[in-house]
Amino acid sequence: MILSGDRLPSVACSGVLVIGDPHVGSRRPGRRKDVVWPQAVLGKLERCVAIANERQLAVVILGDLFDRPVETDVALKNQLIRVLKGFDHRPIVNVGNHDIQHTMLTDGDSLALLGLCDVVDVVATSAPVTEVQVGSRRIGIGMTPYGQAIPTDARGSFSGVDLRAWFTHHDIAFDGGYPGAVPPFAVEGCDLLVNGHIHKTQKSVLAGRTRWMNPGTITRQSVDLVDHVPRAWILDESGALEPQALPFESNVFDLTGRVVDAADASVVAREVESAFVTLLQAESATELKRSGDGSIVRDEIEAKFAQDSTSEAVRAIVRSLLGEAVERHARS
């Protein structure tokens, strides 16, 4: 079903399997080398089904179940439905930015169809969602979709629970972040906040009593995730997240033109970060769409290159990533 403030019945389970941003889509990401796509993604979800059912776990998907709001490949949607219906506990899915064409979930989005057909329970509005009984402890679960305000106080959301966990899909500044990212903050009455959206696993941050965590995506779409290990995570009764291995191939990206001497890695990393901070400061997503081919952003970056005497290796990396960003905006 689609939840807009409704609460699901409480369930007894051995924990909650947390699955980060699957990005299921029929289009193979630009530098992935997979001969057949998206079997790598579906295979990870099938492994998640096995883990959840073997260990009697409830299931939460952190958002971006789909890579595009409208998935046109009917066969792929049927395959995905078949996988998702394999869970003993129906997955609860947060709404991510890739799941929606507008600011909120609508009937035109593929994710809405899965909710209406009871394949998954989709959380469309920020609210408390359900309670789970894990051993002797009761855990309250709430969610905030992409673009909606994360609550600052969760004390009135649940009564009689031992732990409150909230799930979000936002740009959070775990490691300092970029312009526009929200620093972790204390949410009154909330013990754990688990975020999607950011694709790399982040170190947890404690703000007041609220521990913020970001497990990362299970689908590596871009080369900046070449070292990211896709995992699912089990939320236990203590509020800890335990990593679970998922099947993945290490050599899945075409790195032509992207390989840099290892001795220069730290310098390259700093220069790339500096260039992208400039990019994000210079252009909003709206302006990127307005420029169409990314020319406005490209001019800003080239000016930054000239100002900082940026190496050719870093210039090649940033230009390639900018090209990928423009392509993704064109498809969205």
Residue spans of the language-model regions?
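Conserved beta-sheet core of the metallophosphoesterase superfamily
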Residues: 172-239
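Binuclear metal-dependent phosphoesterase catalytic core
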Residues: 129-131, 213-279
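Non-catalytic terminal accessory segments
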Residues: 7, 251-332
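Catalytic metal-binding/acid-base residues of hydrolase active sites
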Residues: 23-25, 65-66, 73, 97-100, ...
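Core catalytic region of metal-dependent phosphoesterases/phosphodiesterases
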Residues: 2-4, 22, 30-129
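Active-site-proximal beta-strand elements of phosphoester/diester hydrolases
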Residues: 14-26, 137-147, 164-169, 212-216
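Active-site neighborhood of phospho(di)ester-bond hydrolases with catalytic His/Asp-centered motifs
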Residues: 18-20, 59-64, 91-97, 121-126, ...
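Conserved catalytic scaffold of divalent metal-dependent phosphoesterases
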Residues: 80, 95, 99-185
